[in-house]
Structures are given as C-alpha cells and as structure tokens.
A protein has these predicted regions:
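Alpha-helical linker/hinge and terminal dimerization helices associated
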Residues: 7, 11, 43-44, 65-87
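A short LG(V/I)-centered, amphipathic sequence patch enriched
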Residues: 41-63
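Short helix-boundary/capping micro-motifs
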Residues: 12-29
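Central regulatory/effector-binding core of bacterial HTH transcription factors
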Residues: 91-153
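Flexible hinge/capping segments at coil-to-helix
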Residues: 156-193
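Beta-alpha-beta core module
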Residues: 155-160, 164, 227-274
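Hydrophobic hinge/microswitch elements
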Residues: 131-134, 139-142, 149, 199-254
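A late-sequence structural motif
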Residues: 254-301
C-alpha cells in the first residue's frame, strides 16, 4: 500500500519540476527522495516519471495517479486539522508573517488561489515593519511561514521567490524628466522625498540607495503605511521609493527605475519540518508569486 510520504515525494517532484528542487523543498537528500518515488513505482508496478536531462515529465501512469494522490494528501491534511481542532490546537489555520509591502503586493493574488483550493483553512496574516521582527516572529513560533527579504543565517528552510525591484515614483508633472524608464537618483538629491517612518523596512532601503548615489534624502513627509506613499506622490508631495509590486494600476504619476538599481531578494522561510499545508502553500507561492506586475513593467519599458 502506498504511503502518504511517498505521495508527498511524488507530488513535490511534480510541483518543483525536478528531483533536486523537490529534495531541497522537503529537506531530504536527493537519493532519499528518489528511493521514496522508486518504492511508490514498485508498489504500483509502473514508472511515474520520464527522467529528462534537466527536468522530469509524467508518464501516462503518473498522470493518472496525480488527482488521486493530491486527494489523498489533502484528505490527510483535513483529517489532521479536524483532529487537532477538537484537541484545541490551532490546526486548520495557516499563519503567514509578511513584510508590509508583501501583504500589499504579491500576497493577494496568491491567497485568492489558495482559498479556492482550501476554503476550510483559515488564514491569519501577521504584518511586520522589518526583516528582524519578521524573523523573530518565526523563531518564536508565531507563524508557519514568513515572506520577506531573505534572512541571513536562517536555520530552517528557505525558498527563494525571486528578485523584487524597487522603483521610483514621481509626481505627474514637473522635473526631472524620465528617460527610457530610468532616472539617475543624483538628479533627485535636492528634492524632498516621501520617506517612511524610522524603523520601517523601506526607510533603510531609501537611505541606502541615496547614499550610493552620493546624497542624504531630504524628507517632505514620513508615513507609516507603504500603501500611502503612491497617493502622496500622485498628490505632488515628492518622489518615493517603493517595491514594484505595490504600485496600483490607477497610479497617475510617473514610474522609473533608479540608477543605480535598487532590488532585493524575497524568500519564504519555514521551520525545518513544515507540515503538509505549509509546504503546499510555499509551493503555490513559488509558482504564482508576481514580483513585477505587468502594468508596471509596461510603463518601465
């Protein structure tokens, strides 16, 4: 009889597209993962994957098994959640810790897909101003997964989601001109900026890129809320540095890439042995997270 662990190994290979990435995601060795899949293939009497040089594809047997294996793993997760719920634990709730800008940008679309597949699993979103408090929340066991800039020295699992660009928002009218979607930050040295409150994750980002351009930013307004920055810029207060993912499609100002460039790596971090629900969420996040919205990319081109 196939085991849930074998099904999980098989499904993770499908989700990740290779045995190497699947082993990294599950926190096991590649030979150990291959043994789990091989045991499942022996149990079923057929191969599940066609091994290609850099990827894998499903055989007819592998495709036939897929919906049933997912149903088994999902049913096991629901059974575990139900049992723990009766016991008074927090099962059945996915706790997501995220940097403010992540909650505004990439998470809404991912959560829409997640809720469609897991309508009975509650989601609790815990938002943080800095990577330090985000990491501390994970270390204290307050969240199942954290999403933000890659934390240094994290001892659990780290799934890199990609590189997030920080862009400069400028008021609709007035100098300086934006050329080919770029602007030298040094041209904004004498302009008062929309800055963030001390301790906010993006306050340090603006200070760092301005320092690289040879100036210290003057401040017109400080805001606690990342979502407020585009509104202040559109009102003509001054420029702001924001993650590309939080720029609303309705933004009426101008958008430019800063020179020098500003970007950061985003990752999802979990404990060393995340449960099935958390692992499934991280896999979905890695597949569907959008770090550069099409409407922003179009205006930068």
């Amino acid at each position: 009889m196939p085991t849930l662990r074998q099904f999980e190994a098989y499904l993770t290979v499908i989700d990740e597209g290779s045995f190497t990435r699947a082993a990294q995601q599950l926190g096991v060795s590649q030979p150990g993962l291959s043994q789990q899949v091989a045991a499942l293939e022996r149990e079923l009497g057929a191969s599940l994957f066609a091994r290609l040089p850099r990827s894998v594809s499903l055989t007819p047997t592998g495709r036939a098994l897929l919906p049933h294996a997912r149903a088994c793993v999902d049913a096991a997760a629901r059974a575990t959640a139900a049992a723990r719920s009766v016991a008074g634990t927090s099962a059945g709730e996915l706790r997501i810790a995220a940097i403010y800008s992540v909650g505004l940008g990439l998470l809404p679309g991912v959560l829409t897909r997640w809720r469609a597949d897991h309508p009975d699993v509650g989601v609790r979103l815990l938002e943080h101003r800095t990577t330090e408090t985000l990491t501390a929340a994970m270390q204290a066991g307050q969240a199942d997964v954290a999403i933000g800039p890659t934390p240094p020295g994290w001892r659990g699992r780290v799934r890199v989601l990609g590189t997030e660009e920080l862009v400069v928002l400028l008021p609709p009218d007035g100098p300086p001109d934006v050329r080919r979607g770029e602007i030298a930050l040094s041209r904004l040295a004498d302009v008062a900026w929309v800055q963030y409150a001390p301790g906010h994750e993006l306050s340090a980002e603006l200070d760092a890129v301005a320092d690289a351009a040879g100036f210290r930013p003057r401040v017109a307004v400080r805001t606690e809320q990342t979502a407020v920055a585009p509104q202040l810029v559109a009102a003509g207060i001054g420029p702001a540095l924001v993650p590309a993912g939080i720029v609303p499609s309705s933004f009426t100002g101008r958008i430019a890439r800063p020179v020098p460039r500003a970007e950061r790596e985003l990752a999802a971090t979990t404990g060393s042995e995340p449960d099935v629900l958390t692992s499934r969420f991280v896999a979905l996040l890695a597949r569907s997270a959008v770090l550069m919205p099409p409407h922003v990319a179009e205006r930068l081109s």
